[in-house]
Amino acid sequence: MSNPKVFFDMAIAGNPAGRIVMELYADTTPRTAENFRALCTGEKGVGRSGKPLHYKGSTFHRVIPNFMCQGGDFTAGNGTGAESIYGAKFADENFIKRHTGPGILSMANAGAGTNGSQFFICTEKTEWLDGKHVVFGKVIEGMNVVRDIEKVGSGSGKTSRPVTIADCGQLS
């Protein structure tokens, strides 16, 4: 079975910015990949928070140039919230894959075993995150869109313009 491919159709300041296509490593991180895939399709309905378990309409709330672009907080929208398809949080699956360079897709967390829905896309090699954050996919198309998102970031992570996932889903 091949790894699933999902997409984000991005908007910057309300304007279409292009599509990011990601391959999810279901072969090495099946639970983490399934969580992200289902949050892209929205197929699990409404979560415990009362919000849809869906990335559509959520933002990239933290973007740091030459580091990463972080999103996935569809409960609070500011980096304080997150919910997985398994409940509030789930354990680190494994650290087989590494943060080897631009385009790596990894889970954001607040310490061991605190994965929810927040994720980040690396814009550089970030080896200091190995063993702390679960790598579960990579960008296979649209890295130029990630670079455009990176341009509205700052050292603090605050974006100069809103970066939104206008639509998302599964391709294969």
UniProtKB/Swiss-Prot annotation:
It is found in: Cytoplasm. Keywords: Cytoplasm, Isomerase, Rotamase. One of its GO terms (molecular function) is cyclosporin A binding. The keyword Isomerase applies. GO terms for cellular component: cytoplasm. Binds cyclosporin A (CsA). CsA mediates some of its effects via an inhibitory action on PPIase. Expressed in meristematic tissues, with higher levels in nodules. The keyword Isomerase applies. Residues 7-170 form the PPIase cyclophilin-type domain. It comes from the Eukaryota. PPIases accelerate the folding of proteins. It catalyzes the cis-trans isomerization of proline imidic peptide bonds in oligopeptides. This is Peptidyl-prolyl cis-trans isomerase. It comes from Lupinus luteus (European yellow lupine).
